[in-house]
């Protein structure tokens, strides 16, 4: 039998709003429901979701709330309806983000419950560190691209070195059959990163003629699809202009005019898209969670297929995460890493979080 402690030292926010910087607090180890896994979390990663939840508590959970929704670790308990996973399986998954995550101090790992359709078995050849940086960003790219990209199409993905962007570029270029994948970045390093991920062309988006360069790459026609995961209203308007007549504009998150949950700004995106008969598609992973959200069978299958694809495509070498930095599971390191994400200072790839001093399983 696996010895499961009653509590652990979680990392998260303890106030309802303005909860950043994060702190540590004792939390009971959660119990899995019928269709859930309890995972001892060995590795995770940082996402903007964590500091936004700490700032805004937009799911309305009563603090203290543990954060850390990317999880890779070992199944130590499971609900009675779970048949696809066994105790001791190495897994990767996404913790329920309207609940609690799995960050913890002390180097002994954290604990998180994961819905079984948001988990996949981790192949032995993939490290817990690599697996632990994938779930949220991979599912965001998968949700934004997989249902919409058709073979041979042209696609523009700004920020192709970012956490979502570098995975989206690989996905579009290497697995979905896009004919032309174009990206952009502000530094030589990040432009090279996007190119290494498979982008056929990468431009400097700060260039005065960036839009002209992008349109020229499509021979003046515009892109079949623009996938914008930047959370920038300025970028939203630019990418909307770049979509061809009748094309698709896919946005990650809450969409134009709502780049944060506390403010609504005027946006011209809908007007721009309507003028050319283009479609506005919202790809928001968080739409599957929160108040009153029920995930139907089709959505569960889609998410499960996405999690399995994250491991399969990694094993095949076609979509692999770029880890820019790895930090230990200390409050100071996590706060520092989240602050760098908040400032969006030319970052690239993912920041991994090691929650255990050893990657050994049971």
What are these regions (language model features)?
Residues 88, 109, 152, 199, ...:
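Local beta-strand N-terminus motif with an aromatic residue
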């Amino acid at each position: 039998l696996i010895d499961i402690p009653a509590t652990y030292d979680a990392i998260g926010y303890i106030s309802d709003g303005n909860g950043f910087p994060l702190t540590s607090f004792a939390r009971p180890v959660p119990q899995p429901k019928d269709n859930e896994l309890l995972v001892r979390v060995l590795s995770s990663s940082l996402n903007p979701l964590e500091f936004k939840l700490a700032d805004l508590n937009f799911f309305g959970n009563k603090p203290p709330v543990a954060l850390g929704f990317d999880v890779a670790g070992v199944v130590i308990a499971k609900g009675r309806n779970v048949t696809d996973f066994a105790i001791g399986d190495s897994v990767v998954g996404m913790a329920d983000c309207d609940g609690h995550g799995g960050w913890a101090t002390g180097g002994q790992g954290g604990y998180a419950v994961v819905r079984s359709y948001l988990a996949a078995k981790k192949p032995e050849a993939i490290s817990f560190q690599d697996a632990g940086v994938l779930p949220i960003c991979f599912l965001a790219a998968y949700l934004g691209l997989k249902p919409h990209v058709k073979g041979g199409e042209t696609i523009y993905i700004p920020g192709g070195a970012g956490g979502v962007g570098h995975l989206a570029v690989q996905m579009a270029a290497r697995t979905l059959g896009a004919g032309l994948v174009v990206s952009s970045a502000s530094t030589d390093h990040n432009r090279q990163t996007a190119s290494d991920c498979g982008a056929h062309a990468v431009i400097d988006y700060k260039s005065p003629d960036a839009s002209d360069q992008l349109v020229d790459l499509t021979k003046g026609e515009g892109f079949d699809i623009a996938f914008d995961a930047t959370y920038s209203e300025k970028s939203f308007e630019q990418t909307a202009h770049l979509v061809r007549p009748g094309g698709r504009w896919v946005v990650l998150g809450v969409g134009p005019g709502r780049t944060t949950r506390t403010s609504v700004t005027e946006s011209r995106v809908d007007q721009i898209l309507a003028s050319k008969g283009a479609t506005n598609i919202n790809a928001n992973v968080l739409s599957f969670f929160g108040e009153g959200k029920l995930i139907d069978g089709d959505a569960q299958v889609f998410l499960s297929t996405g999690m399995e694809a994250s491991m399969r495509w990694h094993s095949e070498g076609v979509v692999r995460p770029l880890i820019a930095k790895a930090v230990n599971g200390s409050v100071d390191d996590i706060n520092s890493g989240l602050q760098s994400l908040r400032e969006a200072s030319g970052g690239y790839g993912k920041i991994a979080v090691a929650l255990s001093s050893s990657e050994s399983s049971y």
